[in-house]
Amino acid sequence: MEFKVENLTGIGEYSKKEFLSKKGEHEGELFIAPNDKVFLVQRKNTIEVRTDRNLSKLLREQYESVMSSRYFGIGGVEVVMSGQMSLDEIYDMARLSYNLTKELE
């Protein structure tokens, strides 16, 4: 199971930037909406997306592979790509994250 942002439909333009740790090491990729805000963080085995608090709580209760986001904090979730959550669900969450991020000022 492999998540590829290039296969994500239903979103507009975005840019990609390398995500570095505090030590300057490659940690993953940041995907940025046109308003210069991150909507997705992709690491080797996880992705992080922006959600609302209610959805975040529901997903964490429903799936063992979903936890609070390290990048977004309580405003997002981090999903371990273990196969517990379907790829379609993950693409839906990424779409939602993009749309929520676009609405931010």
For each predicted feature, which ranges?
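Charge-dense, helix-prone N-terminal extensions
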Residues: 1-105
